[in-house]
Amino acid sequence: MSVKDAVSARIREMCAEKSIKLNELANISGVTPSTVYSMMDARRRDVSVITVKKLCDGLQISLGEFFSCDLFDSLEQEIE
């Protein structure tokens, strides 16, 4: 799993836990829905830390809480 895939999965997981849709998350986070949906698109590779921070603010969690899960602990090495 790539970092981008892990971020997407974590966003979906957090939305499910809080019973909110991606569109709602975008609105409460102050980002456009298209930004959130593009982060979910498997074809897109880049993820902005600033956008992740805004989404965390909308979810009322810290970046540490967001990244503190098994998804990120088991990522493969990015440098080949």
Model feature map: region roles:
Residues 15, 26, 56:
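The alpha-helix within a helix-turn-helix
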Residues 19-38:
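Short alpha-helical DNA-recognition segment
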Residues 57-66:
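Intrinsically disordered, low-complexity basic tails/linkers immediately adjacent to helix-turn-helix/homeobox/MYB/SANT
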Residues 32, 43, 70-74:
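The DNA-recognition helices of helix-turn-helix-type DNA-binding domains
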